[in-house]
Regions:
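Extracellular beta-sheet/turn segments enriched in Thr/Pro/Gly and aliphatic residues
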Residues: 30-31, 101-123
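Short, ordered, surface-exposed loop/turn motifs in non-cytosolic proteins
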Residues: 36-38, 46-60
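Bacterial N-terminal signal peptides
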Residues: 11-24
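Beta-strand-rich domain onsets/edges
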Residues: 24-38, 45
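A short, solvent-exposed loop/turn motif at the edges and junctions
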Residues: 79-106
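Beta-rich carbohydrate-recognition and catalytic domains
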Residues: 112-159, 168-233, 242-292, 303-397, ...
Length: 663
């Protein structure tokens, strides 16, 4: 062996040793013992549960975020075994200020030790965990804490996912998301991702703990498109539902849109899931403007007049204006979908302002002129444009972006979880709760349950099959993203562009919303004043004249309210109902209201409720109007109490709609 060969052997030997040492060092760094980390656990002061998505920031701006257990694994050279101050902040949560006005905690960062930071929840809803993305339990794994998921670090190679829809299919929960990110390149796939999970009580986790998702993946292990089309464009699905076909097989159907851009579609139609290919395939394809509504939102089952329907919580703005009978031939034919409208059959112009809303089949509006579909669809979109709620606390108008509607057994009402467009602290990051007596309304007052600071949380959806304690506890999730409300520079590591789950206790007194008090004909030229449940029990929806005002139900609790009672009196012309705040013996309150104070509330929706008496008939009438146009009515000088006014607009009641016995 010459000198050159000997030198080459020595160099190769040294390189091998260095590679082996580097590998050992890398392996050691990847398997650091948990004892090297200082563990910080942030818990909800009210519940004691760990809080995800809490930022801890050092005085030199190193940012950490708690994982889904509320854990941060801290290991920072130069900052171990010393006192470190962490600024602590989180959307909808906060810690108290110190004497200098700083919100945070000073902790001794001892390896192997744990510190607990208690944080106060401002949100009514409780943040539970992240559903999708990488590193859901990263810090818990690093610190040796137990985790509930089968794939707590990476599942289906999914880095981020947009907008959820779900339904129960073949006894399991079927999940859909839109655009999906991957680790290996900035572009993932854009033709809808899917997964399944077991239901709680049937092999699935308690929804308070998490969801074990089984993704549909390709050969490379990455989530694969489940609605692949040959033509170019992103493919998004919504309106997910199941129905049995002509031979009794359960089928899953969705509306699809093939998009050119975020706001422009190339085509829209209906797609059916193929159990063999495990993909959605178009069954109806059309121009993007030929469906009754451009987006279907979330479908929910309703029984109406002995028939089973799917109603749709249509977005932009959120309103329930479409349904289809739950039959195979109907759900795959847009012409058989029904719309709630004032438009007349063979529509040729704008709707009459005096016309009443009723359910009409789409093909009945279009008639024999198929070319009229786009014109009718545009008119339907205009008709629902001016839809809004009111903040029960401030009286401010809320424009609903999108959300879901389901019947809640605990509240005996239809409830909506929806997103606000144009929120104050985030453009599309404020989530609200509302209730109604029927699925189409009357929807009026709402309460904010989730807030974000210059960050989006869009397309929220309730998961009714996760309800607990008879519906007292409900679960909802949405997409957390900087897009639309924040800046990419402030994107939250791991959490951004992913789904986050919340839980809401419907017995929280802050959810005591004003309910409609209906003015109902009594059949004797008089009027009754009833809550929706009383109207339904008596079967008197057809006798409802109007919503007289809104007040708090007597079974709800709130500070500073007075009870109002309905007292029956006899007049020369028969029976009359009179409201009073002083009860008769053993009387039960009809509703709760605010006391009749003199000062004007800053909430312009809160109004004095006046009693009017008709001398000739002896009847009584109650209104928030300071004067009535009708003759013969004399107003009491002082108001009975203060209530929430009935907003102007059409009275939307679906008296025949009942909750279905399944989702």
């Amino acid at each position: 062996m010459n000198t050159t060969q000997r030198d080459r052997v020595i160099v190769l030997f040294v390189e091998m040793v260095l590679i082996m040492l580097a590998g050992d060092l890398l392996a050691a760094s990847e398997t650091r013992p948990a004892s090297e980390y200082f563990t910080i656990k942030v818990i909800d002061r009210q519940t004691g549960r760990g809080v995800p998505l809490v930022e801890l920031r050092t005085t030199n701006s190193i940012r950490y975020f708690t994982d889904s257990n509320g854990i941060v694994a801290f290991l920072e050279p130069g900052l171990m075994n010393v006192d470190v101050f962490f600024f602590v902040e989180s959307h909808g949560y906060q810690v108290p200020k110190d004497g200098f006005g700083y919100r945070g905690a000073r902790l001794k960062t001892t390896p192997g030790k744990e510190a607990v930071v208690k944080i106060d929840r401002l949100n009514i809803a409780e943040r539970l965990y992240r559903v999708t993305g990488q590193g859901i339990y990263r810090d818990s794994i690093l610190t040796g804490r137990p985790v509930p998921l089968q794939n707590p670090a990476l599942n289906g190679q999914v880095m981020g996912q947009d907008s959820v829809d779900t339904c129960i299919y073949h006894g399991r929960l079927f999940w859909l998301w839109g655009d999906t990110g991957r680790p290996s390149y900035p572009l993932g796939h854009f033709a809808t991702a899917g997964a399944v999970s077991d239901l709680p009580g049937h092999g699935g986790l308690d929804p308070a703990v998490g969801v074990n998702l089984e993704y549909f993946v390709g050969k490379d292990g990455f989530s694969r498109p489940i609605c692949p089309l040959k033509e170019p464009g992103m493919v998004w699905l919504d309106g997910l539902l199941t129905v049995r076909d002509g031979v009794g097989t359960e089928r899953m159907v969705a509306r699809y849109a093939r998009m050119k851009s975020l706001g422009e579609a190339r085509e829209k139609g209906l797609a059916v899931f193929n159990d063999t290919t495990q993909s959605f395939e178009p069954v109806f394809r059309s121009d993007p403007n030929l469906l009754p509504y451009p987006d279907f939102g979330h479908a929910f089952r309703v029984n109406a007049e002995g028939r089973e329907y799917y109603y749709f919580a249509l977005p932009f703005p959120l309103t329930v204006r479409m349904r289809v009978e739950a039959k195979w031939d109907n759900v795959i034919d847009p012409n058989r979908y029904e719309v709630l409208t004032t438009l007349q059959p063979d529509f040729v112009g704008r709707a009459s302002p005096l016309a009443t809303y009723r359910w009409v089949r789409f093909d009945a509006l279009v008639g024999k002129n198929a070319a009229a579909k786009a014109r009718v669809a545009a008119a339907l979109k205009r008709e629902k444009k001016d839809t809004h709620f009111y903040d029960a606390e401030s009286g401010k108008k809320i424009v609903p972006h999108g959300g879901s509607v389901y019947f809640n057994a605990h509240r005996h009402k239809w409830i909506s979880i929806f997103l606000q467009t144009g929120g104050e602290s985030s453009y599309i990051g404020e989530v609200w709760y509302a209730e109604a007596d029927t699925p189409i309304g009357p929807w009026a007052y709402a309460c904010k349950v989730v807030t974000h600071n210059k960050y989006s949380f869009y397309n929220p959806k309730q998961h009714p099959y996760f309800d607990q304690d008879g519906g007292r506890m409900i679960y909802l999730e949405g997409t957390y993203s900087w897009t639309f409300s924040g800046s990419e520079e402030r994107a939250t590591p791991r959490y951004d562009y992913n789904q986050i789950m919340y839980r809401l206790n419907l017995d929280d007194p802050r959810l005591s919303l004003p309910s409609p008090i209906y003015q109902v004909r009594d059949g004797q030229s008089g009027r009754d004043y009833l809550l929706g449940n009383a109207v339904a029990r008596a079967g008197r929806w057809d006798s409802v004249e109007s919503v007289a005002f809104y007040a708090i139900e007597p079974n709800r609790t709130a500070d500073g309210l007075v009870a109002a009672y309905a007292q029956k009196t006899t007049t020369g012309n028969g029976r009359a109902v009179r409201l009073a705040t002083q009860p008769e013996a053993s009387a039960k309150p009809l509703f709760l209201a605010l006391p009749p104070v003199e000062r004007q509330s800053e909430n312009t929706c809160i109004m004095p409720l006046y009693e009017y008496h008709h001398a000739n008939s002896g009847r009584y009438l109650y209104s928030t109007e300071p004067q009535l146009q009708e003759q013969g009515w004399k107003r009491e000088e002082k108001p009975l109490c203060r209530v929430w006014k009935a907003p102007s607009g059409p009275l939307l009641i679906d008296a025949h709609a009942k909750p279905a016995d399944r989702f």
